Amino acid sequence: MLPLDSSDRATLSPEQQFEQDIALVMQNAIARHHDGAFDDAKALYEAILDAIPAHAEANYNLAVLLVDAGRATESIPYFETALGANPGNGQCWVGYINALYRANQMPAAWVAVEMAQQRGVHGPALDGLISQMATPTVTFPTAPAASQDGPDITGSISLNISSQPQPQPQPQVDKGTNGDAPAKPVRKAPLNKLQKHAGLFDKKRSAEALSLARQLVADYPGDGASLRALAVSLYRDRQYAEMIDIAYRALESLPGDLLLRTLLADTLRLMTRLQEAEIQCRAIIATQPTNMEAHRVLGIALHGLRRQQEAVAACRRAVELAPHAASANGALGFVLLDQGAAQEAAPWLRRAIEIDPNDCVSHSSLLFSLIHDDTNSPEMLLKEHRAFGKWHERHALPKKYANSRDPERPLRIGFVSGDLLNHAVAHYLLPVVEYLSRDPNLSLHFYYNYVIEDHITAKLRAHAATWQTVTMLGDAALAEQIRNDRIDILIDLSGHTGRNRLVTLARKPAPLQASWIGYPGTTGMSTIDYYLSDSIVTPAGELDDQFVEKIVRMPALAPYAPPVNCPPVNGLPALHNGYVTYGSFNRLNKLREDVIALWAAVLRAKPDSKMVIGAIEQDRDRDTIAGWFAAEGIDPARLTFQPRATIPVYLQQHHRVDICLDTFPYAGSTTTLNALWMGVPTVTLAGMSIPTRGSASWLKRVDLGAFIAHDKDEFVRKAIALADDLDTLQTVRSGLRERCLASAPFHPDVVAQGLSVALRMMWRRWCAGEAPVSFDAVPPDQSTSALAEQTAG
């Protein structure tokens, strides 16, 4: 803007001249600010504020300048003045919250977050601030995971991968890099050496085949056939990271080798490089549309990318192409199951194990689907689980062990899991391991059945006497390794969920074996002696007939360690909203039409209420759920969908919710604990099996039995009655953290002591030649014992 000359100024009123002068000063201040002349800019902003103290832009810009200068506390009044003039300015809210955070005024910062959200401020900038506020230390990336709780497909491609590529009609030639100098011909491996590799591979002499393939690549670098031999050997040996690099190199020479490309696609999928897997699958299908494996791997990759309709279509196409392939049927069943269609998934999974009774992945997925179906009786579930055990225990090893039968000696405890990363199982396990690793009478040995590691993996590994990644070991080899390691008690942390090694445990490699945390039910295996639980989830004598294992009742099923510096509990939203907000943060595959129908009954009975649904991953999820509500007469305008988010942002989303509504028959567990920690109780529908009791067990721990219903009508009545009593809800909300901290699950040392007692009692019985029995594992310390009794009552 150019300065006005005297004639122009003469035509302006004094007020207009004043406004023009202020605008010119502001323009100059902003220019000086952008040029880095901060002292000059500050002086100009202050001059404006001397004239107009409520000038919104000057207040905001000066506040930003002060924050950038490390003077956050001084900036706060200027942000507040700017917001007073323009309370809908999202950028100003973010700056204000950031200033409060940097000034270490955390309670005020959290209040400001809530106020901003009430004014419609959302988005990445605010979410990023919430994450910083809740986690002021180093933030680590989350581990990729396709499914947090359910089975996944980790089986390899069932193909004759030793078949050799066709000889090339002409030798491959490097392009050369020195002008027009002739390129150096690539030396090709002799056919007899490639055939020798194929013979070793076909005879499953995998170590020799891999060694020979490495030598071939060393002797004939750049030879596509040698690289291919190494790639397929690495695939079988499950050395996936190296396999990917070698396969890409091989395909430069052998671009038409669809078999190798299929193996590469599957390996990329296993390493969660899903976009690359999709690219490879589509390249195969473009050349060979009837390639069943390409469609199958594509379906699983698309599922991991949360493109569910495409995933189902790809898996259905795989079944059409190969209706008698167990892998195709199993993949379709898995994808349907992980979308929450348990009843639709079960026939496909059952078909897979009819085709191949040794398909343990599909068999575990079938059992996982059955516990999600509330039409299945406990007797039927036990029978189905026993069938798994009976079949896979055919290879059980003779029960002779070299372990010393000294009842008081230090014990070697093994943990087997594919979830030793940023996963609910690992979060339960870590605080227990931190305690047990300090016990001189125990040494901890981990067998990790996954290829992905993260910061949680590193924390667990730090407490391990030994740590082995066992993805490359077959069940017989892993069982032999565990026996050679002289493990005294082996603990399965998966049950019938993804990446389990139950078939290894079916061989009984350790004298005593137990299952814990990963699965809410029996494994069905007689080779697993104990199921670790507590007296609330599995009261003495109440659910024993649903288990093959004997039940050990610890002070708590597992500990809960709240995230450090997570958001505080806020006031009850209904008190300022004027209406009640229900909520759900359960994983989406627990949400089905009958679950939505029950929630809709609550919303119909409480017509002014609203609902927040979290963990939304894509627009299609939102549209599907909104459609189910609409079919029940609920206006989608009453629904708010929150995206899947980082832990701090997810926890802060509870600030908008008064009461959570639970899923059924597979109730919440970690989600319920997180909600309790954020002051939000959950109305749950408890039944007569562990999957239905997850939330109920935690609610009983904090004396909130009033939120537990036993049929659908009672669920609706309780959800309405509790919403009508806002004073009680506010009292519960404000005191929930104190209740939590008074209960055993929030004391990892108590749970760890209970586990330590349980392990020693199991061992003493084995040393005495006594059969496993159900028992209570009570820590010897009377104070912790009293805490356990208090919280169980």
Predicted segments, located by residue:
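Donor-sugar nucleotide-binding helix/loop cap in glycosyltransferases
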Residues: 661, 675
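Short acidic/histidine- and often glycine-rich active-site loop of Leloir-type glycosyltransferases
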Residues: 692-703
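Substrate-binding clefts and catalytic carboxylate motifs of secreted carbohydrate-active enzymes
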Residues: 583-594
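Alpha-helical solenoid repeat scaffolds of the TPR/TPR-like class and their adjacent stem/linker regions
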Residues: 1-579, 597, 627-634, 646-659, ...
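Short hydrophobic "strand-cap" motifs at the C-terminus of beta-strands
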Residues: 416, 585-586, 614, 642
